[in-house]
A protein has these predicted regions:
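Glycine-rich phosphate/pyrophosphate-binding beta-alpha loops
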Residues: 143, 147, 205-221, 284
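Gly/Ser/Thr-rich active-site loops/lids in small-molecule metabolic enzymes
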Residues: 156-167, 220-241
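ATP/nucleoside-binding phosphotransfer catalytic cores, i.e., glycine-rich phosphate-binding loops
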Residues: 198, 223, 233-311
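Short Gly/Thr/Asp-enriched flexible loops that form oxyanion-binding sites at enzyme active sites
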Residues: 76-90
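N-terminal glycine-rich "phosphate-gripper" loop used for MgATP/nucleotide binding
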Residues: 71-75
């Protein structure tokens, strides 16, 4: 093998995404064979067999000195692979095959499998941040409130994709009751502007990346390389405000709404009245009433298009 050829592993989650996505996923080995530059990359392909397996596999490939590990799946698979590559020189590539693909969309990675593979032939490596909510890692967003309640309901839904998600939202919107939250950020020896605020909010999102997925950009100006999170506080609002807010969400202008307040922090503590629903990258998790959220700067490397600017 030529010394110039780099080792790359594709970790495939066979069950993420819609039925259509799963059909495309079965074509990935053939697409890799046809489209990957084999003078540049020497590929290995493996499927996950259980929850958390992608982390184990990614860590193993990093220990073996692989140059890159590609997550083939949704945001959950991407998060698992990232966790296995923290603080290593092995870079993560992504072939987005989930229902939301928020992290990949933030990075400008195509959702078409063939185009995502071709990107690997003309890629560069950048270092990005990740977040921690207590002891749980997130790469895109975490949060509490209405979206977390939706995530909890959506997790039990047999149907995936945007339309199934919207249906879940509509079923919950009339019954949801917001609570009051307190957010406290210390100065961290001058590293951030301190604050201590209380708000009755519809939802609060702590954003490392700019979106939940499907280009729903809850934090349009979030930057994966700035060492800080964007804290998006959406106030409770009338039902008539829902459509304008949705329009702003998908046009990247929600931060301009008078119903939204944006804060920025490297670390803060969320105090809730109860241990209500909480999500990590769209997946519901059990959390205590108090949650400390922090951003870990430049924790892992990702492969992006050569023309992608730092963001």
């Amino acid at each position: 093998m030529s010394a110039a050829v780099k080792q790359i592993a594709f970790i495939i989650n066979p069950i993420s995404g819609s039925r259509k996505t799963q059909q495309v996923k079965r074509q990935v080995p053939q697409l890799v064979s046809q489209l990957l530059d084999h003078e540049q990359w020497s590929p290995a392909l493996v499927q996950t067999e259980y929850a958390g397996h992608a982390t184990v596999l990614a860590r193993q490939y990093a220990a073996e000195g692989y140059d890159a590990v590609v997550a083939v799946g949704g945001d959950g698979t991407v998060s698992e692979v990232a966790q296995g590559l923290l603080n290593t020189s092995t870079a993560m590539g992504i072939i987005p095959m989930g229902s939301g693909n928020g992290f990949a969309l933030h990075l400008g990675i195509p959702t078409d499998a063939g185009k995502a593979i071709l990107l690997l032939n003309r890629c560069k490596t950048i270092s990005v941040d990740y977040g921690m909510a207590n002891d749980k890692l997130f790469i895109s967003t975490c949060g509490t409130g209405f979206d977390a309640e939706v995530a909890e309901r959506f997790a039990g839904n047999t149907q995936r994709g945007l339309f199934a998600y919207v249906r879940t939202v509509l079923h919950l919107v009339f019954a949801y009751r917001p609570q009051t939250y307190r957010l406290v950020a210390e100065s961290l020896y001058g590293e951030q502007q301190p604050f201590d605020i209380s708000r009755r909010a519809f939802l609060i999102t702590f954003a490392n990346a700019n979106q939940w997925g499907n280009n729903a950009r809850i934090a349009p100006h979030a930057n994966l390389q700035d060492g800080k999170m964007d804290v998006m506080i959406l106030s409770r609002h009338a039902l008539l405000d829902a459509l304008p807010l949705a329009w702003r969400l998908f046009t990247g202008t929600i931060d301009r709404s008078l119903l939204v307040r944006t804060l920025r922090a490297r670390q803060l503590t969320l105090h809730r009245q109860t241990a209500a629903a909480f999500h990590i990258d769209g997946n519901p998790v059990a959390m205590p009433a108090d949650v400390t959220i922090r951003i870990m700067p430049h924790g892992f490397n990702v492969l992006v298009d050569n023309n992608t600017q730092a963001k």
